[in-house]
Amino acid sequence: MQVFPPPQVPLLGAHTSTAGGLHNAIYEGQEIGASTIQMFTANQRQWRRRPLTDSLINSFKTALKETSLSYIMSHAGYLINPGSPNPEILEKSRICIQQEIQDCISLGINFVNFHPGAAVNDTKETCLDRIISSFSLMEPLFENSPPLVVLFETTAGQGTLVGSNFEELSYLIDNLNHKIPVGVCIDTCHIFAAGYDITSPESWKRVLKNFDDVIGLSYLRAFHLNDSMFPLGQHKDRHAPLGEGDIGIESFKFLMTNEDTRMIPKYLETPGGPDLWAKEIRQLQSFQK
């Protein structure tokens, strides 16, 4: 189930700050030369969300019109675990997922990105089935076909997290794509940490073919661009500035120029803040000239 087409121009951005209001994330994106952004719609480390007001919504939509940024992504909170074996955590997670989706629809956001979940003391198979049940409950929210896609982010495979391999993500998508719009956000640091070699054009082509065979490239809707502080397959989620980690700059140059990936929206999560992101956006844009 797809609700809107891919962008017609390459989109680059970063995870910007909502300090002072959600609309400020949009304006910060404009300041760093971004054409899209990722943001939190609520405090990512709290269960309780502040309700959206008409004023907040209008300010956000005004910022979108003034800046022409598009394909905005919301990153869901870190406490959410839709595969939790703990009934209390599971119920809180499902409430947060519902609220997150509702807020994204109200704001006109196109992507909402979730970490799939963690098995904790259960099996990964049971965790995956529980995640499917959690997101199946969201089907009524999509009855009017809002232009919003739920994205599952690739994980580094640390601890009991699921989603570190394409097979697990495929299982989620195959069981949900007839109920809600779903896709995948590849985090470059995470898949590298999980054991996918993406250090060269040749290795990237193998990974993308694997993705296409297992999931289908039409479900690849976004990238988180991060280098890695640790070598391949260490299952450690530690981001580094582009070209300053073990992945290397050629990997990101490939994503900007390869026909299958150049038009997919890309969001920086590199450590360093707005000044670094502005520099990295200019560098990435230069690869396409």
From Swiss-Prot:
Query: What is its cofactor?
Result: Zn(2+)
- The residues listed in the UniProt record as binding Zn(2+) 3, with positions renumbered to this chain, are 190, 237, 239
- EC numbers listed for it are 3.1.21.2
- What biological-process GO terms show up in the record? base-excision repair
**tRNA-binding keyword on record:** no
Manner of cofactor binding, per the entry note: Binds 3 Zn(2+) ions.
Task: Name the Gene Ontology molecular function terms of this record.
Answer: deoxyribonuclease IV (phage-T4-induced) activity; DNA binding; DNA-(apurinic or apyrimidinic site) endonuclease activity; phosphoric diester hydrolase activity; zinc ion binding
Instruction: Name the chemical reaction catalysed here.
Output: Endonucleolytic cleavage to 5'-phosphooligonucleotide end-products
Positions binding Zn(2+) 2 in this chain are 153, 187, 224, 269
Annotated Zn(2+) 1 binding sites: 75, 115, 153
Establish whether keyword Zinc is in the entry. yes
Organism superkingdom: Bacteria
Keywords from the named record: DNA damage, DNA repair, Endonuclease, Hydrolase, Metal-binding, Nuclease, Zinc
Q: Known PANTHER family for this protein?
A: APURINIC-APYRIMIDINIC ENDONUCLEASE (PTHR21445:SF0), ENDONUCLEASE IV ENDODEOXYRIBONUCLEASE IV (PTHR21445)
Q: Which HAMAP family does the UniProt entry name for this protein?
A: Nfo
NCBIfam families recorded: nfo, PRK01060.1-2
The family annotation for this protein states: Belongs to the AP endonuclease 2 family.
Task: Please describe what this protein does.
Answer: Endonuclease IV plays a role in DNA repair. It cleaves phosphodiester bonds at apurinic or apyrimidinic (AP) sites, generating a 3'-hydroxyl group and a 5'-terminal sugar phosphate.
Recorded protein name is: Probable endonuclease 4
- Species this protein is from: Chlamydia caviae (strain ATCC VR-813 / DSM 19441 / 03DC25 / GPIC) (Chlamydophila caviae)
Protein's gene = nfo
